[in-house]
Amino acid sequence: CGEPVASRGVSWNVGRTFMRDTEVYRFDLQPDADHHRPGMVNLQQYYFEEALVARIGELPAIDLRWRSKVVSVAESADRATLTIECPDGTYALQADWLIVADGARSPIRRMFGLDVEGKVFQDRFLIADVVMKADFPAERWFWFDPPFHPGQSVLLHKQADNVWRIDFQLGWDVDPDEEKKPERVIPRIEAMLGDAREFELEWVSIYTFQCRRMREFRHGRLLFVGDAAHQVSPFGARGANSGIQDTDNLA
């Protein structure tokens, strides 16, 4: 699904870092001459998932089963046996290997009493996906202590369909429910833009982040990947990107 992702997404090479309103660092990562696709592409997760499902439909070796839930897993020396619950009932499924990609709260990891180790950071961040027509270049901009949001950090980059992802550091002591309200979000964006341009909020969320991982990613016939195995800061889509790297490594 690399081609539809690259063609629909926003390609970029330049990243700029500012301290207040002064640029202090800049990179320009050009793809190698023999690379077929750009080095970095920004694309909303729902489009990426659409591309994945479309590609899976072209591969007869993959059986994608919707509305199904793994309710138990049993291991032996040479296989894993899953109990699957679906609208038609419950059935068993055997596999030589089970790739566990069920997210940060991984029910399967918990079934086996396994844990992740690391640190949860006491900080909160506001994500706002904003639809607007802007003449900003398709670059990643990152500010420390900007005049429009003093004492915190802000991240800006472009996605498909004129959607701009803005990430505001808020600190730990804020009220997450209050900060998600439009009357709190809109003034922050207006202060950042510094003009009266029109924009529309597409999506708003508050998150905290952690840096944690399992001590071992392989447990018998189970192979843990993605957020089930390790959790990182979401900056730069590190969670999704590292999950893809995990599965590519297995392949």
Give the ranges of each region predicted by the language model.
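Active-site-adjacent segment of FAD-dependent monooxygenases/related oxidoreductases
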Residues: 1-57, 74, 157
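Short, hydrophobic/aromatic-rich segments at coil-to-beta transitions
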Residues: 78-82, 138-141
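Conserved FAD-binding catalytic core of PHBH/FMO-like flavoproteins
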Residues: 54, 97, 101-209
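Short, conserved active-site loop motifs that form the nucleotide-linked donor/cofactor pocket
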Residues: 62-63, 68, 222
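General small-molecule cofactor/ligand-binding pocket signal
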Residues: 6, 63-65, 117, 202
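Conserved mid-domain beta->alpha element of the FAD-binding
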Residues: 52, 100, 201-203, 207-251
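A conserved short coil-to-beta-strand element within the FAD-binding core of flavoproteins
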Residues: 66-81, 205-207
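Core beta-strand elements of the Rossmann-like FAD/NAD(P) dinucleotide-binding domain
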Residues: 88-97, 219
